[in-house]
Every structure is written in C-alpha cells, then in structure tokens.
C-alpha cells in the first residue's frame, strides 16, 4: 500500500497493477490531522538542550508522538491552537530512544518483514499477490529503492517519494493527478504491461514475482506532503549534507537560518561549514550571535573548529578546563538522601539515545590537552568521557591507542564501565570493548572473548577481532602466525592502518626484505603524507643496516604523527645502533614522556644506561618498566642481565627463571627465548650449577641447532667439567657456524692445550684410546722389523757370513779341546745378533 505524492488516496500494487481505493474527504482530513508530524525544537521556551542530549535532539527527523496522539482528544479549535505553539515540538515523556528510532542512521527491521523477492502466494490467480506485513509505530519497512541513498534505513516518506519515483521511472506514461482518478487505473494497466514486456525481454517465462511494499503513515513517520515549507527545507539540507553536496547544503541551510533564526539551524549551517573545511566561517557564524552561550551544540561545534584551527587555548576557553556538568559532592549527597527517602519525584534525566554532549565535550577537552602535551589532564578527560557515556568508544580508544594507561589501569577502567546501558546488547559490546585491551595481561580472557565473538556473533573475519589475535601473536613473538593473520586482513583492506604496524614489524623480524620493499613503495605512492608510510620506509632501511637513511625517515614519520609510538622508538634505536648514547637517551626520554602508559621507552633507557655501565640508573628505569608491565619477558630478561653484571647471581636467576616461565608458550626459536635460555645458563654456570646449565643449553640446542653461541657455551661447560672431547667438538661446531667467534677461538685453543698437558685417569676414554693406539703401534713396529730382516743386502750379508764363519771356526777349536761351553757360546752369539738386528 502506498500513498500518492499528490493526493491522499492510496493504492495497492498487485503484480504491476494499481488498484485504487477512494477515501472520503472527511476521512482524508482526519488522516491529515492525526498523522501530522511536528518538527522538534528543543530551544523552545519549554526546553533547551542539556548535556544529556546529543545532536539527535536537533535532527530534522525527530517527532512528537505524544502531541499527535493527544490532538485527537482536543476540540478542533484547541487542536489548531496547540499546533501553532512553538513549544509543542518537545515532549520529555517519550521514549529516550524515540529520536534514535526515527533517525535515518538507524535501521530497525523486524524478523518477519518480507524479503524483496518471494514466490507468489496464489499461482492460480491471474494477479499474484503478496500479503505485506503491517509495520508498527516504531518499526521501519525495508526498502530496496535504488534511488534512496539511505536504503532500508530511511524512516520517513522520503522513502515513499523515492519508491514512487522508482515506480514512475519503471513505466512509461504514468501520470497521477488527484483530479483524474481514471488515469490511475489506466496507468496501473500500463505499468502491468510495461512490467510484462520487461520480463519477456529478460527471458522470464515462469510466474512473475512481485513485491508489495506497504507503509502506514503514523505519528512516528514523516510525510513530506504534511510538512511545512521550512521543514521540507530542513530535510533538503540534511539530505544534501549526508550526500556530501556541501554547496547545496550551504545554500539551503543559509536560507533556513535566515527564515527561522533558530540556533539549531545555525548549528546545522555550521556543520556544513565544518564538513567543508571552512572552520573560520563556522567560528564567525557562532560567535557573531553568541550562539555558544545559549546552545550547547553550537558551543561544541565552536570548540571543534578552534581545534582544527590549532587555537587550543581559545577552544579550552569555550568548553572549559574542567567539566562544568560534573556533580557537586553536596548535590550528590542530597540526591542520595532523597532517593533513600523514596522520593517519587526524583528521576534520572531522560536522554535521546545518542552520545551525550557532556561526554563529547570531555572528549574534546582531552584532545586539546593531548595536543598541548598535557598527558595527565588528557588522560583524566578521556576517562571522564567514557565514564559519562559508555557509547563514546573514541575516548576509550584514545586511552588505549595513545598509551595513556598502563595495562593494569586499562583493565581497571574496563571493570568500572557499566555495560547495562546497552541492554540486550550488553554481552556483545562487553566483548568488543575487551578485545581492545592490553595483551600483556589476562590474555586468556581476551582469547575467550574472541572465540565468543567468532562463534556466537559471526565476527570471525571482522577486522577488530583479527587485529586482537594479531596483537596477541606479536606480543608472544609468534611472528609467522602473526604474519599470516595480517595478510588475511590486508587481502581485503590493503592499507588498514591498524594492521600495518604489526605487519611491518613481522616482516622486519622475519627478514622479509622484498615484501617490505614492495609495501613501502606502494605506501609512498598512495599515502605520501602518512606517518605509517615513512615508518615502513625507515624499517626497510633498518633491515638493510643503512642506519642513517632509517634515522631520516623515522624522524619524518614522528613529525607527521607525534603520537606514533613506533616511529619514536625506531628513531631512538638508530642513535643507539650508531653508538650516540646522548641522542639515544634524549629520544627515549621524549618517548617516555609522550607515552606514559608504555613500558618500552623506560626499558630501553635502562638498557642504554647498562651499556654505559651505569648499573644503578639502569636498575631504576628497569624497576619503572617492571611496575608498568611485570609480565614482559624482555623486562625480566634485562633485569636478570643487570643483576648478573652486578654479580648478584641469585637475583639474576630469580628474574631469568620468571622470564623463562613467561615465554614457555612463545616460539622456542625466537630470539627472546634463546636469549633468556642463554642468560639463565650463564647464571647457573656462575653459581657452579654446571649440569643444570648444560641441560639449559641443550634444551635450546634441540630447537635451534644453528646457533653458534649455544655451541660455544656448551663447549665452555664441557671444558670446565673436563669433558675435553665434547668441548672440542662443540667449539669446532661453533666456529663452523660463526668463524669470527673470538670466544670460541680462545676456548678451543685452551682446550687443545689442556688436552696435551692434562694428566688423565687410567679410566678416561682418552687413556683407553691411547693404550689401544700404543699397542697397535708396537705390533706394527715388530712387523716392520720382521719385514726389514728379510731384505737382502750383499755387503752386510758378506760381513755377517764372515763373522759367523769365524765364530764357527772358534767353536770348532773349542770342541776339539773338549770344552763344554759350546752351547753357551752359541747363545751369546745369538744375543749379540739379535742386538745388532735391533739396533739396526
């Protein structure tokens, strides 16, 4: 059922045919009077905007339901008089979400609203009909109008106009005149024929599927034909503003303000100036008539304009240094006593469902303090903004993204928020807020919230849910998994600024220089004035060890966005790598002041002082970092190293064991895990717990066999425990992996010298091996002797034969004399031969 734009008769579209129904003039007049929509003017004498209202209070879509309902019970004269009263545009008895329901930015769809395409209900009938659902007062009908900018969200007869316009465009020769009813029938037939022709051209041979869009004009909807000229101009202005046609919006808004002289109309004209970057004109408009003193919306807009003009002191003068709407303690006590006394007249202020202006002003105050580098007051203002209205998510995000709160303070603030204001949406909103908190603590709770959002609310592919997983992986040094998650998001949103910093960090950690180069090149072409662009370029040069170029672009990135923490830390790192300690300390100190809730600048300050051998100063900064984030393995590792250098090995072991406990779920091949294991092994070595130290090193060696330092450390421990062969093997392996390892070279030299000079036990493997080798040598020598005796030398043989002949002759002479020592003489001769042979 539709209402004709030019008459109050209604018609029903059935299969492309328009069936017309007549209404009596009396019924028509009653329809006009009962469905009259009254534009709200909160600046009327009966009510003005308060800090509990939002800009919805000045929206042209706000209606007065109760006033329209009470008009039916009034006499005609009294009813007309009431319509003329300016204060009739306001009624505080309506639902606090009434204006929100009527806003074009809100979509309220019932589950039983029919979809645009459904099969015909009666296939036997020549005209297939679809029964439409009747929409209640607070419900909106889904619209698939191609001519409507707002689609299914528009809650007024602006949708009716667009629907009729679409219908008029779809047929030829359709003319509607309230004076000629027959034209409607003819045009209905023409519409049916046109639809049939169009379907035949498209090749549809089956039954036609049509859609019946039924709207009922109620007191909560806008009927353009029932609005006054000024109200229609306001709708025109609003629609032009929503479509970013600022010249049209400015032209109409200026006329509306001149006609009405209403501060709300001045506010919307100022909005047009503000959105068109004409901030000076917005300031002149509001200050010329002192509108900031009578309209809180104009005051807020004036403060925004001053901020855009970087006139922060003027902006602070407009909105105040403190929240003027904060309750006085005495007033709060009085209200508490009256509530305890069951005072029925005491009630909470009724809001319109939008973000309260009080919260918006607190947020703007925080932005001003943040721009002035007054971070403590900025933190307090942002915290007050989110506590005043939990719907002000931007204030909550500023506290987290700008590192104004420590991880524990973030969770404390989250626990203090009252999510009951969201009603039935409490669960989803609580989880959506939780996934933005710090990942250094309560990681299990955040992981559980991610699972709930993915399973119960089908948000597994949502950017913020994936970003939460990215932050968890990056914090736990799971760079490969983090890189995969980042790439899934960047496939659909290539330049997502929330994902790019972690993605760039993963590329650097994994030494993926090619992807880092391509990303930096695309960013430089697309966003040459973005801080993330030059951060990526600087990180690429850092991966190439071109420190001077990296320093240049880190500086440029920090200038473009002074609140970009990663750029500040990278800029300070370049000075530290170049050995410029003073400049590095200055840069780290600046980052520590800019980001009071971040522990990394304090950690790096401690590392710089430790490199300068100022262990007491290093300890003080490490303690500050530990107080902010006690579960960061980097902090615990550096504290262990610091106490190791102070020869306090018991304390060093305490912090390193705690760090090892924290990184048990981290990637075992990450540099963080390896460093902690190595440092803990050296600590055990200093405490003469060599076996535990060896186990510690071998545990890492199972995960990373290509680390030269691990082999060097194991070689030293085996050398200390007199296991020379294992020591020499590991030291050789260390030098194979890193030939310029001076420690391994020195240790190997000592091991080889010790292997020569050290007296070993009889049971030592080297002794057993030596005995086996010596026995084999003797056997070989004996065999060689036997072989050498078989060699033929004529000269020697002649001498030996001559000698033997002489001996033989002497023996014969002795035998002739009857001597009895022939045997003995023979034996002595054999001994002398053997002796000669041995000497040879």
Swiss-Prot record:
InterPro entries: TPR-like_helical_dom_sf, TPR_2, TPR_rpt. Residues 67-97, 173-212, 329-350, 802-840 are annotated as: Disordered. Gene3D superfamilies: Tetratricopeptide repeat domain (1.25.40.10). Phosphorylated by CDC28, which is required for the early mitotic activity of the APC/C in its CDC20-bound form. The keyword Repeat applies. Residues 330-347 have a biased composition (Low complexity). SMART domains: TPR. It is found in: Nucleus. Changing residue 95 to A: Abolishes phosphorylation. Keywords: Cell cycle, Cell division, Mitosis, Nucleus, Phosphoprotein, Repeat, TPR repeat, Ubl conjugation pathway. The keyword Protein biosynthesis does not apply. TPR repeats lie at residues 229-260, 263-288, 296-319, 357-388, 393-416, 426-454, 464-492, 499-526, 531-560, 565-593, 600-628, 633-665, 671-703, 708-737. Present with 2753 molecules/cell in log phase SD medium. Component of the anaphase promoting complex/cyclosome (APC/C), a cell cycle-regulated E3 ubiquitin-protein ligase complex that controls progression through mitosis and the G1 phase of the cell cycle. The APC/C is thought to confer substrate specificity and, in the presence of ubiquitin-conjugating E2 enzymes, it catalyzes the formation of protein-ubiquitin conjugates that are subsequently degraded by the 26S proteasome. PANTHER family: CELL DIVISION CYCLE 16,23,27, CELL DIVISION CYCLE PROTEIN 16 HOMOLOG. Belongs to the APC6/CDC16 family. The APC/C is composed of at least 13 subunits that stay tightly associated throughout the cell cycle: APC1, APC2, APC4, APC5, APC9, APC11, CDC16, CDC23, CDC26, CDC27, DOC1, MND2 and SWM1. Interacts with AMA1. This is Anaphase-promoting complex subunit CDC16. It comes from Saccharomyces cerevisiae (strain ATCC 204508 / S288c) (Baker's yeast). The lineage of its organism: Eukaryota, Fungi, Dikarya, Ascomycota, Saccharomycotina.
């Amino acid at each position: 059922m539709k209402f004709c734009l030019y008459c109050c008769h209604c018609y029903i579209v059935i299969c492309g045919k328009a069936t017309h129904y007549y209404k009596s003039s009396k019924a028509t007049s009653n329809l006009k009077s009962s469905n009259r929509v009254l534009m709200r003017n909160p600046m009327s004498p009966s009510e003005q905007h308060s800090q509990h209202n939002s800009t919805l209070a000045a929206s042209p879509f706000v209606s007065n339901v109760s006033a329209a309902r009470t008009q039916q019970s009034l006499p005609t004269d009294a009813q007309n008089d009431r319509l003329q009263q300016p204060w009739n545009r306001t009624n505080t008895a309506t639902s606090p979400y009434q204006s929100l329901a009527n806003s074009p930015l809100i979509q309220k769809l019932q589950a039983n609203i029919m979809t645009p395409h459904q099969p015909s209900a009666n296939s036997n009938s020549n005209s297939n009909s679809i029964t439409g659902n009747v929409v209640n007062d607070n419900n909106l009908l889904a619209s698939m109008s191609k001519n409507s900018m707002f689609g299914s969200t528009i809650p007024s007869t602006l949708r009716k106009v667009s629907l009729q316009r679409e219908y008029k465009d779809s047929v030829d020769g359709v003319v509607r005149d309230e004076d000629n009813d027959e034209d409607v029938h003819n045009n209905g037939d023409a519409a049916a024929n046109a639809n049939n022709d169009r379907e035949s051209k498209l090749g549809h041979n089956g039954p036609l599927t049509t859609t019946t869009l039924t709207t009922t004009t109620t007191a909560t909807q806008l009927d353009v034909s029932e609005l006054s000229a000024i109200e229609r101009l306001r709708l025109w202005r609003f629609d032009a503003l929503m479509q970013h046609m600022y010249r049209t919006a400015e032209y109409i808004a200026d006329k509306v303000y001149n006609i009405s002289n209403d501060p709300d109309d001045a506010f919307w004209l100022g909005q047009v100036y503000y959105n068109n970057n004409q901030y000076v004109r917005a300031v002149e408009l509001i200050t010329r008539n002192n509108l900031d003193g009578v309209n809180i919306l104009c005051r807020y807009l004036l403060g925004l304009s001053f901020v855009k003009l970087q006139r922060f002191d003027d902006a602070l003068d407009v909105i105040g240094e403190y929240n003027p709407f904060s309750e006085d303690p005495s007033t709060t006590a009085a209200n508490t006593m009256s509530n305890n006394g069951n005072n029925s007249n005491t009630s909470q202020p009724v809001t319109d469902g939008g973000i309260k202006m009080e919260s918006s002003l607190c947020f703007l105050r925080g932005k001003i303090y943040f721009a002035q580098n007054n971070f403590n007051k900025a933190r307090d203002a942002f915290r007050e903004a989110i506590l005043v209205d939990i719907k002000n998510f931007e204030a909550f995000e500023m506290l987290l993204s700008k590192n104004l709160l420590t991880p524990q303070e973030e969770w404390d603030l989250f626990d203090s928020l009252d999510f009951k204001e969201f009603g039935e949406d409490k669960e989803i909103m609580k989880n959506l807020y939780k996934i933005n908190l710090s990942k250094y603590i309560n990681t299990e709770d955040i992981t559980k919230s991610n699972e709930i959002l993915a399973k119960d609310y089908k948000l597994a592919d949502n950017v913020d849910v994936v970003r939460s997983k990215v932050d968890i992986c990056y914090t736990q040094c799971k760079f490969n998994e983090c890189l995969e998650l980042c790439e899934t998001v960047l496939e659909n949103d290539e330049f997502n600024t929330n994902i790019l910093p972690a993605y760039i960090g993963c590329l650097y950690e994994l030494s993926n220089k090619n992807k880092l180069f391509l990303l930096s090149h695309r960013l430089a072409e697309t966003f040459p004035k973005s801080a993330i662009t030059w951060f990526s370029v600087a990180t690429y040069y850092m991966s190439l060890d071109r420190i001077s170029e990296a320093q240049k672009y880190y500086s440029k990135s920090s200038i473009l966005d002074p609140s970009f923490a990663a750029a500040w830390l990278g800029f300070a790192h370049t000075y530290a790598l170049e050995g410029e300690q003073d400049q590095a300390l200055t840069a780290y100190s600046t980052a520590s002041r800019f980001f009071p809730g971040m522990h990394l600048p304090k950690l790096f300050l401690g590392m710089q002082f430790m490199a300068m051998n100022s262990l007491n100063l290093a300890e003080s900064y490490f303690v500050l970092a530990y107080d902010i984030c006690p579960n960061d393995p980097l902090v615990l590792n550096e504290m262990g190293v610091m106490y190791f250098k102070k020869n306090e090995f018991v304390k060093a072991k305490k912090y390193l064991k705690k760090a090892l406990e924290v990184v048990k779920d981290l990637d075992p091949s990450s540099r963080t895990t390896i460093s902690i294991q190595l440092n803990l092994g050296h600590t055990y070595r200093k405490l003469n717990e060599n076996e535990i130290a060896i186990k510690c090193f071998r545990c890492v060696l199972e995960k990373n066999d290509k680390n030269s330092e691990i082999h060097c450390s194991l070689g030293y421990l085996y050398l200390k425990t007199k296991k020379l062969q294992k020591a020499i093997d590991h030291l050789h392996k260390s030098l194979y992996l890193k030939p310029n390892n001076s420690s391994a070279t020195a240790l190997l030299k000592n091991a080889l010298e010790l292997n020569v000079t050290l007296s070993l036990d009889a049971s030592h493997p080297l002794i057993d091996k030596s005995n086996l080798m010596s026995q084999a040598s003797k056997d070989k020598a004996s065999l060689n002797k036997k072989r050498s005796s078989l060699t033929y030398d004529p000269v020697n043989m002649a001498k030996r034969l001559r000698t033997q002949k002489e001996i033989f002759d002497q023996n014969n002479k002795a035998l002739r004399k009857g001597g009895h020592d022939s045997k003995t003489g023979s034996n002595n001769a054999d001994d002398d031969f053997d002796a000669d042979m041995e000497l040879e």
